[in-house]
Amino acid sequence: MVKNLLVELGLEEMPAYVVTPSMKQLRDKMGAFLTDHRLTFEKIEMFSTPRRLAVRVVGLADKQSDLTEDFKGPSKKIALDADGNFTKAAEGFVRGKGLTVEDITFREIKGEEYVYVTKEEIGRPVEEIIPAVTEVLQALTFPVSMHWANNTFEYIRPVHTLTVLLDEQAFDLDFLDIKSGRTSRGHRFLGQETEIASADSYEDDLRAQFVIASPLERGDMIVDQIQALEEEHGVSIEIDEDLLNEVLNLVEYPTAFLGNFDAKYLEVPEEVLVTSMKEHQRYFVVRDSEGKLLPHFISVRNGNAEHLENVIKGNEKVLVARLEDGEFFWREDQKLAIADLVEKLNNVTFHEKIGSLAEHMERTGKIAALLAQEAGLDADETADLARAAAIYKFDLLTGMVGEFDELQGIMGEKYALLAGENAAVAAAIREHYMPTSADGELPDTKVGAVLALADKLDTILSFFSVGLIPSGSNDPYALRRATQGVVRILDKFGWNIDLAQLLGRLYELKFDSLSYDNQEAVLDFFRARVEKMMDRSIPKDIVTAVLQSTHFVVRDLVETAALLAEKAQEDNFKSAVESLSRVFNLAEKAQGQTAVNPALFENKEEKDLAAAIEKVVLTSDLAANLDQFFALSPVIDAFFDHTMVMAEDEAVRNNRLALLASLTAKAGQIAQFNQINTK
């Protein structure tokens, strides 16, 4: 017979960003716990609010599965003495398994007999296992934790209740400083403590106390209420998924309402208003049918509709204070001169080990000038890039960005346009921050893209140069995001920029403020980011071989890996790769020498291979490039069949190694073929 198990942990209000991950973690750890304890189940349902985490295990077996295990012991010749009696070795073995020598059998393995015992464990009733679920709660991890009262332990927030029910049966367990039972808490203001009758009645019992336990249901309620307000007021409301997910984790009983603000604030840039509403107040933005911002907002109350008019007034008052700040900064910032703000950046620290923001901008400007050539910018674009690089951080010292740091770059563009900068320069100031997340929006303009690349490259190289390199999951300066941004921008614009060569040129640049260092570590860091762009179905050895190539153009690397993975299914792949691998392995002994003297050739096969290598011309057609090298396989094999590479004559030997190295110099731009596993 199956049962349903409810486990609910009641806490003080958790931060919204913690709720959903913690709920999923509880589900996963509970599932692992039950599996480890040989308890089968149909599914695990999840529940959470700001003040609770819960799971309901549906279709839980009423007892553990029986367990039968075979254990191999010592060989028969060790287990029995000369008289055929069990030795101490045999007795010790079975005693350790809780058995006796009477349970011993012998089994033959590869011509020799060994002791075997079979141990059977009858499954225990689920009621005997449930007390251990506190181990699951104790194992939960959180990004932040705290002490409370006189306790020595830490948890995300103080724990008030623990409800553990198997159908209708409540369990009295100890967890941290509380006892479990069937008591739960209702809404902080509208509800009260309540008894949960059974695992199945959980949602209904809490609903009666103004708690909607299911986050999915709360989300649906919020969306339905917003859509009703849309219809009632004839407006269009942006339901931002991230904001919705945050808001539903701020409330236990949601009630959406529409508030208003003075239309005069619409004269402030829309981004300021939207940031004030979404980022600071967690409000949904209201627009008309054409997408124009309206002087309204949608908020969600943690409670019912009683006295809602007071709640609306309170929210309107709070928002107006924010909008007043935005209006003030918008007006005052326009009185500031860009040149004065740029000069003050000399006094703003980028990082104490790296220098000022002004020095960062100077290095970025030099990198941008170099990249302008690589990206093929014309004269006007290059001039716009130089101007943007000279001023692009000025808005960090404006009042608006000081108050709303989410608007950095965005306000820079607006203030630059007001100051008379052209549109390309202004757009680059905004776009240089892109992307702001792993899959965030990328720059649209070439000038903005190059400035973004230059800014990120100096950031990466500077931090690596002073030893501030990400390790494990620790990346306080977001260098992985910056590196991923470089890779994604290069891929989007399809610029044929070889990152390895580019880094080499950057490391030759000289600055008064900093000397770049750790070049190989930076290149490895980029390799790791490019690897994440590749199809996960591509074998690891192929990915490694491609990433170790001497040609480091992002788009080419991704495409080459995919092409090699396709070729791996062809009949000639194994033989071709093995031939090339042999060349790569021997060519390492050439120590970089690729100059070949045809006068030292002693057989036809040497001449044939040299001629074949000479004919290889790499183009932008990556598939054709691969085909050229795979077609060399018979010529390579013939060379090895008739040629002793490591000849006694040093000149002949070195010439043959140089011949092979001349091939790897070309093939190595595709992949390090000896890294590919053909077995």
From Swiss-Prot:
| GO CC annotation | cytosol
Q: Pfam families attached here?
A: DALR_1 (PF05746), tRNA_synt_2f (PF02092)
Tell me the keywords, alphabetical order: Aminoacyl-tRNA synthetase, ATP-binding, Cytoplasm, Ligase, Nucleotide-binding, Protein biosynthesis
Q: Which domain of life is it from?
A: Bacteria
Signal peptide positions on this chain = none
Enzyme category, top tier = ligase
Report the transmembrane regions from the record: none
Whether Nucleotide-binding counts among this entry's keywords is: yes
Q: What is its EC number?
A: 6.1.1.14
User: Record's InterPro entries?
Assistant: DALR_anticod-bd, Gly-tRNA-synth_bsu, Gly-tRNA-synth_heterodimer
Q: Which reaction does it catalyse?
A: tRNA(Gly) + glycine + ATP = glycyl-tRNA(Gly) + AMP + diphosphate
Q: What is its main location?
A: cytoplasm
One GO BP annotation is: arginyl-tRNA aminoacylation
Compartmental location: Cytoplasm
Q: Which GO terms describe its molecular function?
A: arginine-tRNA ligase activity; ATP binding; glycine-tRNA ligase activity
Give the record's family classification.
Belongs to the class-II aminoacyl-tRNA synthetase family.
Q: Give the record's subunit note.
A: Tetramer of two alpha and two beta subunits.
This chain belongs to which protein, by name?
A: Glycine--tRNA ligase beta subunit
Naturally occurring in which organism (per UniProt): Streptococcus gordonii (strain Challis / ATCC 35105 / BCRC 15272 / CH1 / DL1 / V288)
